[in-house]
Swiss-Prot record:
Organism of this sequence: Pseudomonas syringae pv. tomato (strain ATCC BAA-871 / DC3000)
Main enzyme class: transferase
HAMAP family: Formyl_trans
Family, similarity comment: Belongs to the Fmt family.
Positions annotated to bind (6S)-5,6,7,8-tetrahydrofolate: S113, L114, L115, P116
Catalytic activity reported: L-methionyl-tRNA(fMet) + (6R)-10-formyltetrahydrofolate = N-formyl-L-methionyl-tRNA(fMet) + (6S)-5,6,7,8-tetrahydrofolate + H(+)
Name assigned to this protein: Methionyl-tRNA formyltransferase
Molecular-function GO term, any one: methionyl-tRNA formyltransferase activity
Lineage of producing organism: Bacteria, Pseudomonadati, Pseudomonadota, Gammaproteobacteria, Pseudomonadales
Record-linked InterPro entries: Fmt, Formyl_trans_C, Formyl_trans_C_sf, Formyl_transf_N, Formyl_transf_N_sf, Formyl_transferase-like_C_sf, GART_AS, Met-tRNA-FMT_C
Entry EC no(s): 2.1.2.9
Gene Ontology CC entries for this record: cytosol
TM spans (from-to): none
Gene3D superfamilies: Formyl transferase, C-terminal domain (3.10.25.10), Formyl transferase, N-terminal domain (3.40.50.170)
Alphabetically ordered keywords of this record: Protein biosynthesis, Transferase
Length: 314
């Protein structure tokens, strides 16, 4: 084995924290952690540290939270750490070329897709939404472009018909860390050669927003079924029922035809709603002020709300 490396880690959400855990358990020295500034969160809107910051503080690792890495002071601070390598995972800040050039071995990134497919901010959810057969993690050498660098290695997992954005996220968070450790070993030995991405195969995974999660019942049922899975646990697909908000946490395909959004049937098996093509069976819902419930429980206690012929989304 080569000598342990001086590594700077940059990341923010839980997905990144799983990678940091693996690095902390490795022989390498984590000399500093970069993460996004604390953000307001929760009902009280208190400033909350990122999962990566919380983990770093538990291990007494210096934490840097510059609002940008374009400032000369921030770049000088990074250079003073004399890193051999920078590992970047869902950090959320652009790294200019001057920063990419600071570490002796450069910067690598663990990205939650099989590049060049799904460059960008929401690759996990977009893969589920599109009905992709597989996903994975790509470890790449970073360039100034967005997720465009040479690919060092990939770890692949199939996407099942039951996968949600959440379940795929958790599986990729397990695949990514060992892939990064393998890539670091290869870079340190000089045995790992990057493969250029084919830009003609690239597409962009746009950031999620709540407006996208509003169900358009004129869309085909299979498209909406994938959307429900992709947007769980956030932002959660939603509609309205008698002018009240209705969150849809789980659904599957059903037979049926009718005006889009119309309740075709309601039973303990689910609420069947007509779509632009075919129908969707809603199996887990959340009403205002309530917690998420299987439709069986809602049907037993609130069946009068789900009258046949009622139209959702009006």
């Amino acid at each position: 084995m080569t000598e342990p490396l001086r590594i700077v880690f940059a990341g923010t959400p839980e997905f990144a924290a799983e990678h940091l855990k693996a690095l902390l358990d490795s022989p390498h020295q984590i000399v500093a952690v970069y993460t996004q500034p604390d953000r307001p969160a929760g009902r009280g809107q208190k400033l909350m540290p990122s999962p990566v910051k919380q983990l770093a503080l538990q291990h007494d690792i210096p934490v840097m939270q510059p609002p940008t890495l374009r400032a000369p002071e921030a770049q000088a601070e990074l250079a003073a750490l004399k890193p051999d390598l920078m590992v970047v995972v869902a950090y959320g800040l652009i790294l200019p070329q001057v920063v990419l050039d600071i570490p002796r071995l450069g910067c690598i990134n663990s990205h939650a897709s099989l590049l060049p497919r799904w460059r960008g901010a929401a690759p996990i959810q977009r893969a589920v939404q599109a009905g992709d057969a597989e996903s994975g993690v790509t470890v790449m050498r970073m360039e100034a472009g967005l997720d465009t660098g040479p690919m060092l290695l990939k770890a692949v997992t199939p996407i099942s018909a039951q996968d949600t954005g959440g379940t795929l996220h958790d599986r990729l968070a397990e695949l990514g860390p060992p892939a990064v450790l393998q890539a670091i070993a290869g870079l340190a030995e000089g045995s790992l050669v990057g493969e250029a991405q084919d830009d003609s195969l690239a597409n962009y995974a746009h950031k999620l927003n709540k407006d996208e999660a509003r169900i358009d019942w004129t869309r085909p049922a299979d498209e909406l079924e994938r959307l429900v899975r992709a947007f769980n646990p956030w932002p959660i697909c939603h509609s309205t029922l008698n002018e009240e908000a209705l969150k849809v946490l789980a659904a599957d395909l059903a037979e049926g035809q009718g005006a889009p959004g119309t309740i075709l049937s309601a039973s303990k098996d689910g609420l069947i709603v007509a779509c632009g093509q075919n129908a969707l069976r809603l199996t887990r819902l959340q009403l205002p002020g309530g917690k998420p419930l299987n439709f069986t429980d809602l049907f037993n206690s609130r069946r009068e709300k789900f009258a046949i012929g009622t139209v959702l989304g009006q």
